Amino acid sequence: MAKLTVKDVDLKGKKVLVRVDFNVPLKDGVITNDNRITAALPTIKYIIEQGGRAILFSHLGRVKEEADKAGKSLAPVAADLAAKLGQDVVFPGVTRGAELEAAINALEDGQVLLVENTRYEDVDGKKESKNDPELGKYWASLGDGIFVNDAFGTAHRAHASNVGISANVEKAVAGFLLENEIAYIQEAVETPERPFVAILGGSKVSDKIGVIENLLEKADKVLIGGGMTYTFYKAQGIEIGNSLVEEDKLDVAKALLEKANGKLILPVDSKEANAFAGYTEVRDTEGEAVSEGFLGLDIGPKSIAKFDEALTGAKTVVWNGPMGVFENPDFQTGTIGVMDAIVKQPGVKSIIGGGDSAAAAINLGRADKFSWISTGGGASMELLEGKVLPGLAALTEK
């Protein structure tokens, strides 16, 4: 990577500002999935082991007005992080002001402080989300000229807590997580070991147009599953019953199929049901067509076999988006089948692009079989699309 990383700077005795991604799910104040906290530990531990004083910034959920602050405090995260680090985490519970400044100035080498949810600053004019220059400058002033960005999940956003701080420090560097995310995803797309197969699922073609276009140029094959299958089907005149379709994207789907030169591989059958919820009948279709009064909710057994064949011998696989409504056991067979087809390839570099695919791999017990699972759905999508991420662009060049 052509950007400075945390290993390129002297941290001893320095107040080091760190953007992490602690945007974790909370239920009644309890963290229900701590993966993002765990993912940030190597960078935090490195900073404190080097004698730095880690000052952490993160958002949590969306905060638009004062009432939204309830249930969006990072207090439970501070407690969880302290337990994981085996040391106290200072948590002043504010995003600015004398109390925060005093707590930061009282830090000793090897200590950790967590600033309150950066999006609390969005209540007054969206200062965080709109990258207010004064806020970025203020937060930068709390440190000693070093900023570590380890929040891949927000790298596609230009916020005060990443791009804003970067613009006001001497050195803005990548943390280990950000470095790994970029290395795995960018290298897979730009310099893959071939054959390179991309698998795209999810419900909407509109979410993935740019990704499909970019991957058709880079990959050897692009497999399509999930709800967007039916927009591609309808574009070819195939009956789709009551399946999800984006009528305004039929021309786009048709154009992608024409451009693909046979690289785009669609399912050849579906698992269909007579309703999305409260269905009384589930069955496999004979071929591509979905029956009248039914909707396709997963790829069928013939498609799983076809995708398995398409993946044979693959050396690089990037997967983004489930094959069906995997949260429902009746419609998770396709996602499981594709996951198993990926991970059984000898010597394959397998990457999951965050979001629902990551949730599927974790929930269905296959997370440890993949080379890399991205922590950022939106950011990984933009990398797959070939876009420049603002949070990455703002870092100091080597």
Swiss-Prot record:
Origin: domain of life: Bacteria
Recorded name of the encoding gene: pgk
Keyword ATP-binding: yes
Catalytic activity entry: (2R)-3-phosphoglycerate + ATP = (2R)-3-phospho-glyceroyl phosphate + ADP
Name of the protein in its database record: Phosphoglycerate kinase
GO molecular function, one term: ATP binding
Pathway: Carbohydrate degradation; glycolysis; pyruvate from D-glyceraldehyde 3-phosphate: step 2/5
Localization of this protein: Cytoplasm
EC number annotated for this UniProt entry: 2.7.2.3
Family matches, as InterPro entries: Phosphoglycerate_kinase, Phosphoglycerate_kinase_CS, Phosphoglycerate_kinase_N, Phosphoglycerate_kinase_sf
Family designation: Belongs to the phosphoglycerate kinase family.
Annotated GO biological process: gluconeogenesis; glycolytic process
Organism of origin: Streptococcus pneumoniae (strain 70585)
